[in-house]
Amino acid sequence: MSVKNSFSGVLFCLILSSWTFALAQAPSGGEPEPKAQAMPQKVVVVLAMHGEPPNDFPKDEFGRFFALHARLHYAEGADEDLHLRYAALDAKIRGWPRTAENDPFHAASQRMAEQLRETTGLEVEVGFNEFCGPTIEEAIEKAVARKAEAIIVVTPMMTPGGIHAEIQIPATVKQARERHPGLSIRYAWPFDPSEVAQFLAKRIHQESQESN
C-alpha cells in the first residue's frame, strides 16, 4: 500500500474515532448530543482545509488585504468602508483561478479529498478556512444540496489549541446547524492524541526502514 493510500485510510479511522472521542470529551451542560444511531443512508464528508493564497496574486493587493485585516482586527468600531474593501479583496483572493503551480496546497487538498472518496465510499466536499474558495460554509451548503442525511466535517488540523480547528470551524458548524435544524451536522474533532501519536509513530517507523 502506498503512503498516500495509507494516509487516507488512517485519516478515515481517525475521523471515526475522533467522533467518538469528541462525544466522550464533551463538557456537561453543553449542547445535548443525539443518541448513537446507525449510519444514515447518505453521509457527505466536508473536508475542512486551511487554505493558502495563490502565489501569482498581485502582491500589492495582497499587502492591502493584510493591512485591512490588521486594522479590522485591532481597531474598535471600524467603519463600513473598511469591511467592504476587506470583503472585496477576500472574495478576489478566494476566487482566484487555482492550478497546481500557483497553489500546490489546493491541488494537494483535492487529492486528499479524492483519496477519502476512494477509501470511505462517501461523497466529499472540500472547503477552505481562508484564502481559497469554496469556504467551509459553502462546502457544507454543497453537501446539503447533495441531499445529505448527515454531514461530517473533518480537518487534518489535528493539534488542539489552534484558532482554526478549535474556534472558527466549530463556529461555522454551529451556524450551519442553526440553518438546518433537522440535519445532523457533526464535527469529527478533536482527535484522540494517542491515535495521532500512533499514526506519527507509523510514519517514523516507515522512514527509518527506508533509510536503512
Protein language model features and the residues they cover:
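Bacterial N-terminal signal peptides
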Residues: 10-20
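Active-site-proximal alpha-helix that buttresses catalytic centers in soluble enzyme cores
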Residues: 24-212
